[in-house]
Amino acid sequence: MTKLVRSRLDLTWVFTTMKRLRLPVLAVLFLAISPVQGGEIQIPVIKDGEAQVIKELEDSDYWIRHDLWVETEFDLDGDGKLDRMHVSVTRPTQTDTQSLKLPVIYNSSPYFAGTTGGDESYFWDARQELGDEPPKRSAAPAIEREGTRPIISKRHVKDWLPRGFVVVHSSAPGTGLSQGCPTVGDDPEALAPKAVIDWLCGRAKGFTEPFGGEPVEAYWSSGKVGMTGTSYNGTIPLAAATTGVEGLEVIIPVAPNTSYYHYYRSNGLVRHPGGYLGEDIDILYDFIHSGGDEETRAYCDCHIRDEQMMANQDRATGDYNDFWYSRDYLNRVDGVKAAVLMAHAFNDWNVVPEHSIRIYEALKKNGVETQLFMHQGGHGGPPPISMMNRWFTHYLYGEDNGVEKGSKSWIVREKDERTKPTEYPQYPHPEAKDVVVYPVPGAPQRGRLQTAPLTEPITETLVDNFSFAGETLAQAEYTEHRLIYTTPELSEAVHLSGTPRIKLRLACDRPAANLSVWLVSLPWNTQKNSKITDNIITRGWADPQNIESMRESKPLVPGQFYDIEFDLQPDDQVIAKGQQIGLMVFSSDRDYTLHPTPGTKLTIDLQHTQLSLPVVGGTIPLESQD
């Protein structure tokens, strides 16, 4: 293979090329000392509906890398100038040598330049009485910025560039070398990636520097863009799609946070994401705020974190408000035009599965091409690369591979590898029907679940104590700190598909209480090699003070009974023959809720309590209840 290396002293060639291609100087210098391939190649190469790896594109020595700043339509940092987002581009040399125009895989993130890491010293103290203002928290540690120009990140490059795609990264507002402030949701986190897509399609301005600089054009872009990413990086593609920006053809969000209220609250209750007790939206702001100089950071901290987030997040009541409304992408989903492949896990207790299910359902209703990939693991986990390939190849290269036809739901079964999902026409399973079961008393031991309601009023009482983990309470044979009701052993496996729903009539001896509900599979598997699906079926949480409205808490009248009804997290799981399905009701969930002083009593009226289970086939096969 012929390699041509220009002399260092051939600066006339360098700057002539820079002017012609409108590239940053750094990028052209990189190109100037890089080898050049001879002969033209065909891009893309498609086989069986997928873009294939092209040998000539695998060698990173033949990639062009450069960075730039794209101008947005907002000024968050108060300097009187429109904020610019830091963007990096990695593309095949053939975009210059053959003047190719290629589609783009775009990934945006607030994490590229670093975070506060595992330091949780500045998190909120969960030891808080319900309804009280939280104790003051500590200041967050400084972020040691990572990354060097022109490379922001190398994620996705090896997967997609050799298949004939340009890969683009950008840092979110207020992070890395992007200007502005983090807003953690809200308009700017949608408008920032929109600006980058507009630049890729020739509608927005790009520059070689964060201030001033020479114009940069994406002359190598075909104007067709796909986005993907996981967690926060999966939220941003959805945010961009809600703007309806032209050129964004397809997104594959993985475990996206689609509502910051649903991330930090649950049915009016302050409920932390799994593994991050004490985190709230202001904590996440500090976690990612790696951008700006000292003066800019102070401005952002004051005007965004303190005046907006800390003033409106409301850790005292957990109520919904306009601040949270503006950070819920379901409220903007009507703007989505791009095709969407949602990916999530049913046992993700960080970003719980409702985040993707609610968007999937709304997009289906709106007639947007959408499919769902779900697995049985925890947070993260993209679809198989072959599935993603088919989506990107279809929507970005126009290949008629039938990806939009056929099954709409792809679910990895309990014992299968994530690369081998099972196809279903839709989610939930079309044959799933609600089966209602009712509790029979047994406290402080275990009661039963049966398919007939009680004919006489019976109550049982539990005593709140956050000291005990939910896993401990579920396994306990005898405790006053939870109520638990189980089916008889299943005579056949039961396939749950959909969203369980709980109805409770309860009274409390205090004006406020946490309410937690778990569905569990018993007996509990205590083996070291147990899987998460062996024990936890699903969970849910709610604030009894928000029975009438999510926007306004009303103190409970001690001793008065209230009816409360809410969804648990969506699921699709097969409960094995011989297991029992258990409904556990308790108050404070040690790993998720606030930790008020123990001792609050919740009394449940069993005659007016029921659980609705979405069962494929519509029946639960039970052994004799005698």
From Swiss-Prot:
Keywords from the named record: Aminopeptidase, Hydrolase, Protease, Serine protease
UniProt xrefs under Pfam families: Peptidase_S15 (PF02129), PepX_C (PF08530)
GO terms under biological process: proteolysis
GO molecular function: aminopeptidase activity; dipeptidyl-peptidase activity; serine-type peptidase activity
Catalysis performed (reactions): Hydrolyzes Xaa-Pro-|- bonds to release unblocked, N-terminal dipeptides from substrates including Ala-Pro-|-p-nitroanilide and (sequentially) Tyr-Pro-|-Phe-Pro-|-Gly-Pro-|-Ile
Source superkingdom: Bacteria
Active site: S231, D348, H379
EC number: 3.4.14.11
InterPro entries to which the protein is assigned, alphabetical: AB_hydrolase_fold, CocE/Ser_esterase, Galactose-bd-like_sf, Pept_S15_Xpro, Xaa-Pro-like_dom, Xaa-Pro_dipept_C, Xaa-Pro_dipeptidyl-ppase/CocE
Class of enzymatic activity (EC top level): hydrolase
Family: Belongs to the peptidase S15 family.
Name of the protein described by the UniProt record: Putative Xaa-Pro dipeptidyl-peptidase
Species: Rhodopirellula baltica (strain DSM 10527 / NCIMB 13988 / SH1)
